[in-house]
C-alpha cells in the first residue's frame, strides 16, 4: 500500500465485483477509498445515470462515494452532490469545437467554473436536519400571522370572519385552532 487515496470507477460492475474489489483494496492496506458511480455510456443521459446509487454505495461499502460523470452539462453532477457525492470526475476541454472522442460531454472552462459553483451550492444547501426557525430566520418571525380582533366585541360574542383576522405581525395567537382550542379565548 502506498498510503495514497484510491479512486475506483464502478462502471458496469456488479455488487459482487465491487465487493471483491473493495475487499482486495482494504486487504492491501487502502484506508482512503473513493468509489465513483459511473455510467459507461458516452455521453450518458441523466435518465441512465442512476445517481440514487450513490448513498447506497456509501452504505454498502462504508467509504467516500462520488460520480464519474459522462453526461452533458452540470445537472447530473449537482444532483450527485445533493445525494452525498464528495468527488466529481468530469471530462474537460479548452474548446469543444476542436473535437475529440469525449468532446461532446466535456466541459469548457466557463462550464467547469459553473460546475464548481453549483456543486458547492448544492453541498451547502444539504445542511442538516432542521425544524423550527434557524438563527437566520428568527428576525422573520414577525412576518408570521397571528389572530387579531379587528372590531369591538361584546362579552360572549362569537368570533366571526367580520371580527377576527389572521394578520401580521405574528405576535398574537397562532391562526391554527389546534394551538388555542383549549385556551380561554371565548
Spans of features found by a protein language model:
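Catalytic cores and adjacent flexible loops of soluble metabolic enzymes
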Residues: 1-186
Amino acid at each position: 500500500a502506498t498510503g495514497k487515496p484510491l479512486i475506483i470507477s464502478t462502471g458496469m460492475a456488479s455488487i459482487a465485483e465491487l465487493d471483491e474489489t473493495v475487499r482486495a483494496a482494504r486487504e492491501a492496506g487502502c484506508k482512503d477509498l473513493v468509489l465513483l458511480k459511473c455510467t459507461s455510456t458516452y455521453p450518458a443521459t441523466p435518465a441512465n445515470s442512476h445517481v440514487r446509487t450513490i448513498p447506497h454505495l456509501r452504505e454498502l461499502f462504508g467509504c467516500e462515494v462520488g460520480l464519474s460523470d459522462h453526461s452533458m452539462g452540470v445537472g447530473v453532477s449537482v444532483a450527485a452532490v445533493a445525494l452525498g457525492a464528495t468527488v466529481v470526475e468530469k471530462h474537460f476541454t479548452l474548446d469543444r469545437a476542436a473535437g475529440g472522442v469525449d468532446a461532446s460531454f466535456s466541459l469548457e472552462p466557463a462550464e467547469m467554473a459553473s460546475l464548481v459553483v453549483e456543486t458547492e451550492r448544492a453541498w451547502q444547501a444539504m445542511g442538516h436536519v432542521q425544524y423550527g426557525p434557524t438563527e437566520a430566520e428568527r428576525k422573520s418571525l414577525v412576518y408570521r400571522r397571528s389572530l387579531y380582533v379587528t372590531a369591538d366585541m361584546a362579552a360572549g360574542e362569537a368570533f366571526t370572519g367580520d371580527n377576527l383576522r389572521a394578520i401580521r405581525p405574528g405576535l398574537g395567537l397562532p391562526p391554527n385552532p389546534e394551538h388555542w382550542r383549549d385556551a380561554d379565548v371565548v
